[in-house]
Design a protein with these regions (language model features):
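Conserved loop->alpha-helix
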Residues: 1-184
Length: 184
């Protein structure tokens, strides 16, 4: 973050040549617009609501982040619809290796629990994952070694905050049911 607290500056040698000012880029799953571009450095304006709702306010110099360009129309979709509209940040309860894979358990904030479903989709720091366990106050996903090596999941630990985006389809279903419910 810059000293103004409303801009995020990142050095992105692989991504920077492929984006321009005005393009959307997901940073830890949060959709941001490139507002400045100089060489390998990208600048993003960050709203206060975004800082309040995400883990971006906790970033420090050299913090690893997940970066991803917006999906182009016609490009293959390899996961679920991730929009970059973070619902909340949630605390990592545990991150443990089991055999060759990794189990990540994350706190499930009560305000969002109705969006979580066993075998449903969720994005954590922008990574499309499947809810493998739905517990009373948390959920767990399994991480394969490739995902761990190629994302910032490799750097998280119990107590860290991750960005969580629940499946948009659950939100649309909720909205449709609310509109079709009889009104008193």
């Amino acid at each position: 973050m810059t000293d103004r607290g409303t801009q995020l500056q990142l050095t992105a040698p692989k991504l920077a040549p492929a984006v321009a000012v005005g393009d959307s880029v997901a940073v830890n799953g949060c959709c941001l617009t490139v507002s400045g571009h100089r060489g390998e450095q990208l600048t993003f304006d960050v709203l206060e609501e975004t800082l309040d709702r995400t883990n971006l306010k906790r970033l420090r110099r050299d913090s690893p982040v997940n970066l991803e360009r917006a999906l182009a129309a016609g490009a293959p979709l390899g996961g679920h619809f991730v929009q970059g509209h973070i619902d909340c940040s949630a605390k990592v309860i545990s991150f443990e290796r089991t055999g060759e894979d990794y189990r990540l358990e994350v706190d499930l904030p009560a305000d969002f629990a109705h969006y979580a479903a066993y075998k449903g989709s969720v994005a954590i720091n922008g990574i499309s994952l499947t809810i493998a366990e739905l517990l009373e106050k948390s959920f767990a996903v399994w991480i394969i070694p490739h995902t761990k090596r190629h994302t910032n999941i490799d750097n998280i630990a119990a107590g860290d905050l991750v960005n969580v985006e629940f499946d948009i389809l659950a939100k649309y279903v909720e909205r449709m049911l609310a509109r079709s419910a009889p009104h008193d």
